[in-house]
Every structure is written in C-alpha cells, then in structure tokens.
Amino acid sequence: MSAAPAPAPAAAAPRALPSRLSQFYALTKPRVVQLIVFCAFIGMVLAVPGMPSGAQWALMAVASAGIWLVAGAAAAFNCIVEQGIDAKMKRTAWRPTAKGELSNTQTLLFSALLCAAGSALLYWWVNPLTMWLTFATFVGYAVIYTVILKPLTPQNIVIGGASGAMPPVLGWAAMTGEVGPEALILFLIIFLWTPPHFWALALYRVEDYRKSGLPMLPVTHGNEFTRLQVFLYTLILFAGCLMPFVYGMSSWIYLAAAVVLSAGFCLYGFRLWRDYSDTLARKTFRFSLIHLSLLFAALLVDHYLL
C-alpha cells in the first residue's frame, strides 16, 4: 500500500499575503497612530462651533485618513532608522524590521507611499496648510527626533515632544485653515504630558535602553533624578491642563475632569518619586495614557453639552 502523498507546498500560500500585510501594518505602530488620530479628531471637533454639518463630518474623515497615513509613514521610517536598536530591546524586538522580515527598501518604499498618499489627500481634499503642517510633523519626528535628538541628548523627549504634540493643531487647521490660540493650548498640554509619560516607561525599561545605547534620562542621570523629573512635570502639566478653562474654551465639566485626572497623575508621580518600583512605574505609564485620553474626551463632552 503506497504512502499518502505529502501536502502540496502551495497549501501555505493563502496565509502568505495576510502575513505580509500584517507585517506592513505593524510598521505603522497602530496603537500610537490611533492616539495621534484621536487627538487630531478632538482638535477638529473643537474647531467647529456646535454640531458639525454633513460636509464637515466628511472633511473630518478625510483629514483623519490623511493624518493617519502620514503618521504611519513616520512610524515606518522610524523602524528603518532604529532597526538595530529595536533588535536589542525586548519591547521592540518583535518589529518586522528588527526581525529581518521586511527589508529596508521595502519599508522605505512603504513609508514613502503612505506619506505621498496622505500628503496628497490633505493637500487636495483638506487644505495646503494642514498638509504642510503634517509633513513638517513627519520631518520633526522621523528626522529631527529619531535621527538627531534621540541618540544625542537625554532631553530628546522634551525637545522632540513638539512633533508628538502637533495632532490637535493639525485637526484645528484642517477645519479652519489656520492655527488658533485654542490649538496651541492643546499643543501645550500634550507637550507637557510627553516627558512624564515616556520617562515612566524608560524607568522600568532602563536595561533595554542601556543595551540600546540610547541616552535616555534614567541611563544618563539615574533612577532617582528621573523620578523627580516625572513628579515635577506632572505638577507643571496640572497647571497646563487648566488652560482650556482659563482661556474660556471649556466649562466646569472639563475643569472637574482635568482636576481629578491631573491630581491622579500627580499622585502617581509623587508615589513614584518617594517609593519606586517597576510595577508602580508601569502603572504610572499606563495611567498617563488614560489621563490624556479621558482629558481630551472631557473636552469633547464639554464642547457639546455646554
């Protein structure tokens, strides 16, 4: 009796395309980009008095898609530059470029395609100002921060945080064709939020960063100094989060949420400074994400209720 024939190699083919697509999708750092688009969307909504019209909702959708594409392009370019660093760090070793699953040429072409598509979408269907601001953000993150600042100085997060704080400005520009003071207040909040957010991560990932050779603050200045900086920045951030109410762009609903959320972040910062543990640093990092998401959600609720 003859043996059963071996399965044909072609049987694995249907899984190849989905696997390759998932690798390209991973390059865009989806969770990070989702937060970017969310913050940009909040900027869009706040820029429109009252309930948006159908045409304005359509404009928001197109602008969000364009910003998503360019943000994904910046993330993919970052994966090329930091391929060697990512391979040394447990947190990033899974990335397709770090594992050698995608070549630099493939990743660069993918990044260029996303950037070109997003820029064209923003230029022709939104407005040129939004396109140029979004492209400047791409350059700020992918080149100035990733290539120059990140390997050069422990203040990389502080200076480079400007590019990460741009999403609400992009959203505001998409709907109004200008950058108003309200957009700059939203920019300030994210700019002040960025250092304690990333330094909390760097504290419990310090060995990863030490192996990578990046001059993150816990590596260059030590654990205790970084913990103090996290706490001090949460205090400064508290003041910054009050600015929408002080300027008159929100009411007591946002104010109450800002006080509670910012006080919680300050408490985490204080506890981290006084009694450090990796577990607490991880909780502080996670709370920072909750803080920003709920803070901007409170702005949205406040905008429509009062």
Curated annotation (Swiss-Prot):
Its EC number is 2.5.1.141. It is a multi-pass membrane protein. It is an enzyme of class 2 (transferase). Keywords: Cell inner membrane, Cell membrane, Heme biosynthesis, Membrane, Transferase, Transmembrane, Transmembrane helix. The keyword Protease does not apply. The keyword Transmembrane applies. It catalyses: heme b + (2E,6E)-farnesyl diphosphate + H2O = Fe(II)-heme o + diphosphate. The chain crosses the membrane at residues 32-52, 57-77, 108-128, 129-149, 157-177, 183-203, 230-250, 252-272, 285-305. GO terms for cellular component: plasma membrane. GO terms for molecular function: protoheme IX farnesyltransferase activity. It is found in: Cell inner membrane. Coiled coil: none annotated. GO terms for biological process: heme O biosynthetic process. Belongs to the UbiA prenyltransferase family. Protoheme IX farnesyltransferase subfamily. This is Protoheme IX farnesyltransferase.
